Amino acid sequence: MASSVSLQFLTNTFISKPQGFCNGIVSAPRPRSNLLRDRQNGVRPIKVASIETQPFPLFQSPASEESSSSELETADPDFYKIGYVRSVRAYGVEFKEGPDGFGVYASKDIEPRRRARVIMEIPLELMITIRQKHPWMFFPDIVPIGHPIFDIINSTDPEIDWDIRLACLLLFSFDRDDHFWRLYGDFLPAADECSSLLLATEEDLAELQDPDLVSTIRQQQKRILDFWEKNWHSGVPLKIKRLAEDPERFIWAVSMAQTRCISMQTRVGALVQELNMMIPYADMLNHSFEPNCFLHWRPKDRMLEVMSNAGQDIKKGEEMTINYMPGQKNNMLMERYGFSTPVNPWDAIKFSGDSRIHLNSFLSVFNIYGLPEEYYHDSELSRGDTFVDGAVIAAARTLPTWSDIDLPPIPSAERKAVKELQDECRKMLAEYPTTAEQDQKLLDSMSEARTTFATAVKYRMHRKMFIGKIIKALDIYQERLLY
């Protein structure tokens, strides 16, 4: 009975639009840009057999209530079938696809409990994993003895090429008839659907309005392209050449590795390893700075558990999330995953002046408490005020402040400091060639823009929105200062 219930939950679990099953064979997603041509122009952009299963009534998706958002589509049944027959289990969650990609959502109310609750189980046998440090070890070991792909992996830089090693294993998995990722790969985003900046063109990178980030992405693109040219030359064996016949295919695989890799410590028997892992189904969990889920390794049966937080009330339809990179600014999230947010509580800007405001006064105005690394907002004291969000928390961390328990703040001096800090913020905004409003209009006017182009515009817009939020927060601060 328990297994029947878990299968019922799984019927809504897998979000995807297949790229096209054709007689049981699916062509791999094709990247959109020609890297060799772009390189000559000074630009550096960047089969899967279906399982035969007998009809089974529980595989039919149950009639569900209308989604709170009409933009969300339920998952393709094939997505959960290929996992269920391989011991993947999901409890009380469903996978859906929206305009911004895939996500995992609660299919029923999850009441708060004293202990964390398992919502997903994925066995080790379905993962692609590699040890973080040399010597490279795979769990499970899918590379036959003597296969040249191991020599290619062994030639990578141990310090910086972790993504290339995972990409090589991913491509090798696609080439094996009996490997799960040959099926699962059909549900991965194609190159024109992926927001990773590894796939960005020079035109896309120019929209970032961030020279440092542009330089970093160009270096990564060059590193990956050079590696492909070195190891996929005309003289390589066919078993290697067919893995990535063109650089676009290889860069797409590296982008998948970067955006879907999870690093964690595992134990198999007595062997404890720090692994880089590509975990199917768990890689559909989106990011949040206030996640309601976390990942846990269960060593007794070599399972990865996705667990909901203890004591947290989750309503039906609420998205299940994890925190990808705690404590990282938007530029790091953009470099690694290809997304940003205007409410990142860890974002920061550099102030060059000497003006400072009183820290404790600023925190008390917005009901922010805790140590700097653990700031939180007490919404109960805000009486419905929705102004405070992650950007205000970030402002409390990034604004120049002073604190002295023996000296109270002088309102006139605080207002002077507020004005000087606001002026510096306005100068930062004036240095950008566009405003946040213009960026939003540009996004609204693009009906079918490239994913990487839209991602770049959002990044610069979110930066300006963050600076604008700091200006507004300083306005509220000086208005609420006690005389």
UniProtKB/Swiss-Prot annotation:
Origin organism of this chain?
A: Arabidopsis thaliana
Residues that, per the record, bind S-adenosyl-L-methionine: Y324
The record describes the protein's role as: Essential for chloroplast development, especially for thylakoid formation. Involved in plastid gene expression, probably by maintaining plastid-encoded RNA polymerase (PEP) activity.
Which superkingdom heads the taxonomic lineage of this protein's source? Eukaryota
Domain (SET): residue spans on this chain: 80-325
What is this protein's record name? Protein PLASTID TRANSCRIPTIONALLY ACTIVE 14
Broad class of the protein's primary localization = plastid
- Kindly give the Gene3D superfamilies that the UniProt entry links to this protein: Rubisco LSMT, substrate-binding domain (3.90.1420.10), set domain protein methyltransferase, domain 1 (3.90.1410.10)
One Pfam family this chain carries?
SET
What keywords are assigned to this protein?
Chloroplast, Methyltransferase, Plastid, S-adenosyl-L-methionine, Thylakoid, Transcription, Transcription regulation, Transferase, Transit peptide
Instruction: Specify the transit peptide boundaries.
Output: 1-62
Query: Gene encoding this polypeptide?
Result: PTAC14
- State the tissue distribution: Mostly expressed in leaves, flowers and seedlings, and, to a lower extent, in stems and roots.
| GO function terms (MF aspect) | methyltransferase activity
Locate the transmembrane regions by residue number.
none
Tell me the null mutant phenotype: Seedling lethal, even with Suc as a carbon source. Impaired thylakoid formation in the initial process of chloroplast development leading to albino seedlings unable to grow photoautotrophically. Reduced plastid-encoded RNA polymerase (PEP) activity.
The listed locations are: Plastid, Chloroplast thylakoid
Choose any GO biological process term that the UniProt entry carries and state it.
Answer: thylakoid membrane organization
Q: What induces or represses its expression, per the UniProt entry?
A: By light. Induced by cytokinin (e.g. trans-zeatin).
Q: What is its EC number?
A: 2.1.1.-
Q: State the family it belongs to.
A: Belongs to the class V-like SAM-binding methyltransferase superfamily.
This protein's assembly is summarised as: Component of the transcriptionally active chromosome (TAC) complexes. Interacts with PTAC12/HMR/PAP5 and PTAC7. Binds to SL1/MTERF3.
Q: Which SUPFAM superfamilies match?
A: RuBisCo LSMT C-terminal, substrate-binding domain, SET domain
Gene Ontology CC annotations of this record: chloroplast nucleoid; chloroplast thylakoid; plastid-encoded plastid RNA polymerase complex
